[in-house]
Design a protein with these regions (language model features):
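Internal catalytic domains of large membrane-associated glycosyltransferases
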Residues: 98, 102-450
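Loop-to-transmembrane boundary segments
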Residues: 43-62, 144-155, 452-476, 550, ...
């Protein structure tokens, strides 16, 4: 059934709305000059099917990994730290310990997979929340496209796909363009497409402020949150609205799928053809993929594929009611968002009034002051349905999850139901990842979910795991520089590379790889592992930025490739690669002259090559 498309009747004096015209035809293919035009027919891979036997094997391998890891670290601290060079020995052992903590947290948060059962799409308000017979009516939904400086024609594509969404019942579907850029061209696109257009006179609160303005001038029971480049699939509404039959469900998050990723060449084919190794190369490539999973050479040069994050991490948090909102591709219950905003508004006023009047001893005077101050505070404070924060999506999730009275639930729907564009250059990628890291760390410092009442143990653990991941430089930096220190000085952080060392580290590493392979079965994680290490410099800058008390500003992620030389973004990576190469040469000469032992060199060589493979992908991306 085609949706009824309209716009909000109400508008504040500071806002502008454009009345809709007759809707145009359903979505058309993009213009040929769009870089993503050749990818229009791509379809997302389905979510990995649940398999109880594979989950049991993963859990068994994870337990073995944790036992072997604990055994290895106990041996490292008691028997193999190079105390004679403690300034390298202790930092490495500490880095290994911190990395192992991350492994423990990963296994705990991905321990099991329990998808929420789907229900039939509701038709009326009373099916998702309390409504008297007199107040009952067909369900209404607002589809929101916040935009600032994106090409209006790009937004048109998204709007047209939204207009093509279907639903099995006659409900009211309102599509709105939320233009924080106040552009005549964007206004005209909205008019031509027959959808609502909302703007405002200021950009306070950035995207969150834009969303707040939209909520003030719309009235849908459910809110579909999109980005300017979000292209909803026709089935998005009918596949997600059924979850809201559970009146505790505050929001549903669907995976973000980037349909413009470079698919690369499968490793066996690349070895056989590009390196001209023929059948032998193909055989070697297949053997490597059996251990590490599918590898496509040149695929996704910026590590943008979010499947690991959504199909493994977010999906496995579902059972604990701990998957969080990620903005685009999410559907919110208006009642939940507005109710939490009202509670926060009341709390702010209560705190301010108490601070100004609690010291007044006269009961009558105190009551008069509270009334007067309360009225003034009510005028001074604003209702903020979405937190004015660079990471408003996860912040809003934390607030909703921690409501001890309503006990709001979240649902992660594992099936991609929209498509989006990914960063096409390293500058855009860096802006986006800095925002993710800085926003999460800022929340950790100023409103840490671990200290927030109302969250369950598992919710705190899983939010804490997300925060912990952004402290990764504490262990990735030592792991990057230790081989280089050895190559130049001959000083090893491990006291001896003997049979005891191999006997402890090899079983742990092999079992860890097996557990990770089983836990991420069917998901390409290789590139993500590399970028986790290569991300160190942006991560350091975000961490220092937040620790210095600087605000993390909201920057719109560019939707087209930015031109320029981005070598300045990877100078630390280049420096580490050069030092690694020079260091290997120096130590190799010493080995040839018999001045150094071979064992430490071999271990550090393989270690350094792994580091170099991760660092080099970001260097190549800078010049792509």
């Amino acid at each position: 059934m085609a949706p009824a498309i309209s716009m909000s009747d109400a508008a504040a004096a500071s806002d502008t709305t454009v009345a809709p015209t007759t809707p145009t035809e359903p979505a058309l293919p993009p213009a040929p000059d769009w870089y993503f035009a050749p990818f229009e027919d791509r379809k997302p891979a389905p979510p990995v099917a649940y398999h109880a036997g594979r989950e049991w094997l993963f859990q068994a391998a994870a337990v073995c990994t944790l036992v072997l890891g604990g055994w290895y670290l106990a041996w490292r601290w008691t028997s193999s730290v190079n105390w004679g060079a403690w300034y390298v020995g202790v930092p490495l052992a500490a880095a290994e310990t911190l990395a192992f903590v991350g492994t423990v947290l990963f296994f705990l948060t991905t321990w099991r997979n329990r998808d929420t059962a789907m229900e039939s799409p509701p038709a009326r308000l009373s099916e998702i929340q309390h409504a008297s017979p007199r107040d009952d009516r067909p369900l209404s939904v607002d589809v929101l496209f916040p935009t600032y400086n994106e090409d209006p024609e790009l937004v048109r594509l998204s709007v047209r796909d939204a207009k093509a969404m279907r639903y099995p019942h006659a409900i009211e579907i309102n599509i709105h363009v939320l233009d924080d850029g106040t552009r005549d061209a964007m206004r005209e696109v909205a008019r031509q497409e027959g959808v609502g257009y909302l703007t405002r006179t200021s950009n306070i609160g950035s995207k969150a402020g834009n969303m707040r303005n939209a909520l003030e001038h719309t009235g849908g029971d459910l809110l579909v949150i999109c980005d300017a480049d979000t292209r909803p699939f026709p089935e998005l509404l009918e596949r997600t609205f059924g979850y809201f039959r559970d009146r505790r469900v505050a929001w549903v998050q669907t995976p973000q799928w980037f349909y413009d990723l470079d698919e690369g060449t499968p490793l066996p084919a690349w070895l056989a053809a590009r390196l001209r190794l023929g059948a032998v190369g193909a055989l070697v490539g297949r053997a490597i993929e059996r251990v590490l999973g599918p590898i496509h050479v040149g695929r996704d040069p910026f590590g943008n594929d979010p499947q690991m994050f959504y199909d493994v991490i977010q999906r496995r948090r579902n059972w604990a009611n701990a998957s969080f909102g990620c903005g685009a591709g999410s559907i919110y219950r208006r009642e939940a968002v507005m109710e939490e905003a009202l509670k926060a508004y009341a709390d702010e006023i209560r705190v301010e009034v108490a601070a100004l009047t609690d010291g007044v001893e006269d009961v009558q005077l105190r009551a008069q002051l509270r009334e007067s101050v309360g009225a003034e505070a009510a005028r001074a404070h604003e209702l903020t349905p979405y937190k004015f924060h660079v990471s408003e999506d996860i912040y809003t999730s934390i607030i909703l999850h921690s409501d001890r009275e309503r006990k709001w639930r979240s649902v992660f729907h594992p099936e991609p139901l929209s498509k989006m564009l990914s960063p096409q250059d390293l500058l855009t990628w860096t802006i986006q990842r800095f925002k993710y890291a800085g926003g999460t760390l800022d929340i950790a410092i100023h409103d840490n979910p671990l200290l927030r009442p109302g969250l369950s143990f598992w919710q705190k653990l899983m939010y804490g795991t997300t925060i912990y991941s952004y402290f990764a430089p504490l262990w990735t930096v030592p792991l990057l520089v230790m081989p280089i220190i050895y190559f130049f000085t001959g000083i090893a952080a491990v006291s001896s590379y003997d049979t005891a060392f191999y006997g402890h580290v090899v079983p742990f590493l092999v079992m860890n790889r097996l557990a990770f392979m089983l836990g991420t079965w069917g998901v390409q994680s290789w590139r993500g592992e590399q970028y986790y290490l290569a991300f160190f410099w942006t991560n350091i800058k975000a961490l220092l930025h937040v620790l210095r008390g600087l605000p993390v500003k909201f920057h719109v992620t560019p939707k087209v490739k930015q031109a320029g030389n981005f070598a300045a973004l990877v100078w630390p990576h280049i420096a580490l690669l050069v030092l690694t190469g020079v260091g290997i040469a120096i130590r190799a000469v010493d080995i040839a002259q018999g001045s150094s032992a071979l064992g430490p060199f071999v271990v550090n060589l393989f270690w350094a090559l792994w580091n170099a493979s991760s660092l080099s992908i970001m260097v190549f991306a800078a010049f792509r």
